[in-house]
Amino acid sequence: MTSNLNLLQRSCALLLAGAALAFMGCDDTKPAPPAQPKTSQFETGRFALQKMIPAARSWSPDANPIQLTSSTNSESIGHDGKSGFWRAVFASPARGKSEPFSWSGLVDPDVPRGVNHGVEDTYSAANRSMMTWDLNYLKVDTDQAFETAQQHGGKTLLEKESKLPVTYLLDFDAMSHQLRWHVIYGTPAKLTVFVDASSGNFLRKE
């Protein structure tokens, strides 16, 4: 009887050991696959500005933009009205301060993705060259502004120089009371086309 009991105990022990080994084998985790590299994101000026607004309004509830500018790089030269990096300056008339904000979609260790901000500076609402403007007036985005600029000299220029970078600047002209896009061909500029950012109409070129 005792020998049978010992045999049964040894059998149970072997079964438990086998089960434990099987469990440990199943528990072995495979190494995670390497993370896929991120790709850069390119967006229009209005898209980038809308991304910056919450951060600017958090900085100051009355903040409105003064200026918006794009940058080009080896991945994007602005021919579709898009950029991977946009910079805006917002101002708070109530506080008498301005602050730069930026949006980046680039894969660059030196340029963090998303919205960031710079150093606060002084601001005077009396300076007509630094007037803020209401976002409701921005009806026309950079892709549309580019198409308009193409019809007024841009297309001819790019046919000659297909790699010429195109950058964008948005500001308010106090003299004409117009919110306008500057579509700038080349650095330094070989052609600048001004487009009404509310109506999309061609204004002038230089």
Regions from the PLM with identified roles:
Residues 2-13:
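Bacterial N-terminal signal peptides that target proteins for export
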